[in-house]
Amino acid sequence: MLKITISFVLSLLVSVASFAQVDRSQFPKAGPAPVIKIGEAETFTLANGLKVFVVENDKLPRVSFTLVFERDPLFEGDKAGLTGFVGQMMKAGTTNRTKDQIDEEVDFIGANLGVSSTSMSASSLKKHQGKILDLMADVLYNPIFPEEELEKLKKQSLTGLATSKDDPNSISRRLSSAMVYGKDHPYGESTTAESIGNVTVEDVKSYYNTFFKPNIAYLAIVGDMSKSEAEQVVKKYFGEWKPGDVPKFTYDTPDPLAKTVVGLVDRSSSVQTVIDIAQPIDLTVGDEDYISSRVLNQIFGGGSSSRLFTNLREDKGYTYGAYSSFSADKLIGEFSASASVRTEVTDSAVYEFIYEINRLVEDGVTQEELDKAKANLAGSFGRSLESPAAIASFALNIERYDLPKDYYETYLQKMNALTVADINRTADDLIDPSKLYITAVGNGAEIKDKLAQFGEVLMFDNMGYPAKEMEAVDADMTSEKVIDNYIAAIGGMDKAQAIKGAKLEMAAEVMGTKLTIELIHDDANMRFAQKTLVGGNVMQTSVIKDGKGTASVQGQSMPMSDEQVDAAKLSTYFLPELHYESMGYTLTLDGIKDVEGTPAYKVIVATPLGSSVNNYYSVETGLKVKNENPVSGDTFYSDYQEKNGVLIPMTQTIKSAMIPVPLEAKITKLEINPELTEADFN
C-alpha cells in the first residue's frame, strides 16, 4: 500500500553529495621533514592524584580543558548501553543548575562543555575561563541524575537501536566486532532493547561514583595559561576532589583463527552487500609499528589514491569507495577493510580484497607509493596542529603510553625516515592473509554459495548473534499452500473475494512531520490512487489505471515507466494474494526464516517483467508479517483487526536504511467496497 509514498518520503530525506574532480597525475615530491614546534607540556600532580599537563600558547586568547579518565574497558553485559547515558545524565542538571541553565550559561559566553563516560572537556575565551571552570566543576561534582532524563534518553536509544537493526552498515559493524572479539568482550558486545531497559538511575550513579576519580584522571590544559596560573586554577577547582579505589579489569585476548571464516547476515531486500574484512592485531600507540602502520594504511586503503580504491572503484567499478584502517588500542587493535558493493559482484569484490591483502604482504609497497603516502600524512598531521583537542591528546598520549617527551615534535622526522623495508615488515607483522574474518550483510540467497569459496559461511542475525536454526519446511508444503493458508487465516476465500475495493486513510510521522496517506483500491477494475499530505497540503499523488501509471510530486507530474508500473502492480490490489495467479506472478517458497523472533515462510513473488518482492507468512498463524521490497525497504504488518469478516493489518511499520527512524503508519479510516467514480482516479 505504501510503496510509492515511501519513495516520496525517501526523496525528502536523501541528500546528494557532489565530489570535485582532482588532478592526481602530478604529485608533489616529498621534501625534508619540517621541525614541529608543538610546545612542551609542563606537568604537575595534585595530592589527590590528578595529573595535569599544561601546553601554553598565548597566540589566541583561548583556553581549553580536557579531562580524561584512564579506566580499563568495561564489559557492560545485561546493562549494555549504560555508559552511553552517563555524560548526558551528568549534564541534565546539578544541585545548583537545571539542564537549561547549564546550556544557557555555556552559550552566553560562547563556550563549549562536553561530558562522556570517560572524559570531560571545556573551552572558552580566556576572559571567561573562571565561568566555564565553575560550570565544569558543578557538573563534575554535583550531578543529580534526574529519572525523567534517563527515561527520555532510553527512549531515544531504543529508537536509534531500532533504526540500526535495519541499517546494513550498523549491522556490519556489530557483526564484525562480534566475530573478531566475541560477544563476551567489551569490544564485541551489543546494546539490546533488553539491556537498555535494564539500566536504572542507580546504575548511572554507581558508575559515576566508581570511575569519576582524580587518581585515574589526566587534565590537559592548552592555550593562554602558564603553569603557575594553572597550578592556582587547578587547585581551586579540582583540589578538593576526593580520590578512591577504582576496579581493574582484564580480558582474554581473542583466540586466533585457524583459517579464514565468513559471517553472513541475510537481508533479502538489500541490493548491495556491505563487506568487512577484519583481524585482531597487536598494535598500541608508540609501538615500533605504529607510525609505519599509518603509512601502510594510507597506501593500502587510506584514501582515493590507495590500492583498494584504485582497484575496486576506479578499475572494477564495484563500489563508490573501499577503505581500510589499522586501529591501535592498549587492549587489542584491529585491521579492517570494507566497502559496499552491488550484490552481483559480492564474491568478485571479496576476491579483490583478498588479492590486495596478499599482494601487500607478499610483494610489499613501492618507493613511489611510500613517498606519496608520506606527503599526504605530513599535510594531515600539520593541519591537526591547529586543533587544541589534538594538542591536548598529544600531551595525554605521552603520559598514557609512556612515549618520549619529543614523540610528536619528531613525529614527521620518524615518519620521513621510514623505508620501503620498514613498511613491508609492518605489513608482515600485522596481517595474516590466511586467518581473516570476512563479514557480509546482503541478500543471502544471491551471495551465500558464492562466498563459500573463501571459508566456512556462518549465519548471524542483525545483532551479531548466531542465526536461529529454523525448522525444515515440510516436504508437502508449497508456496501455493502458504498463500492458501494466509487467505484462510484472514477469513477465507469467500469473504476475501467479496472485497472489490477499499478507501483508507493512514496517519504517520517522520521526525516530527505528520503525514496523511489516502489510498483507493479498485480491485474490480485494477485501478489504484494514492495521495500523501504533509501538514494538510498535497505533496505527492500517484495513479495507476488502464495499465499505465502517473506520479506527481508537488505538482510536477511524470509518467511511470513500464518497469515502475510492473513493480507497482504488486500494491495495486487491496488483497494482492488473491490475484497472483491471474497476474502471471511466479511464486517460490524459500524456506522458513526468522522475522524478529517469529518463524515465517518466505515466499518470493516475481512479476512477468522480473521485478520481485519477498513476503513472509507466520508458520503459526498463517498471517503475513513482513514484506521486503528493494525500493521501499522492509514493511512489517501488525495489529490485525476484523473488518467485513476479513483480518486487516491496521499498522504497517516501514524500516529502511534511507529513513532515519522506522515509519509507523496506522489506518485511521477504512471503507470497504465504497462507491468509486472516475474522479477518484484523476
Regions found by a protein language model. Name each.
Residues 22-29, 218-283, 442, 448-472:
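An aromatic/glycine/proline-enriched structural segment found at the starts
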Residues 481-556, 585-589, 594:
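N-terminal mature ectodomain segment of secretory-pathway/periplasmic proteins
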Residues 535, 598-681:
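Gly/Pro-enriched, hydrophobic low-complexity segments
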Residues 93-96, 124-154, 284, 327-384, ...:
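M16/insulysin-pitrilysin zinc metalloprotease superfamily fold
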Residues 21-26, 164-213, 234, 323, ...:
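Scaffold signal of the M16-like zinc-metallopeptidase fold and its non-catalytic homologs
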Residues 64-126, 166, 186-190, 302-318:
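M16/MPP (pitrilysin/insulinase) zinc-metallopeptidase core fold and M16-derived inactive scaffolds
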Residues 276-278, 301-341:
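A structural supersecondary motif
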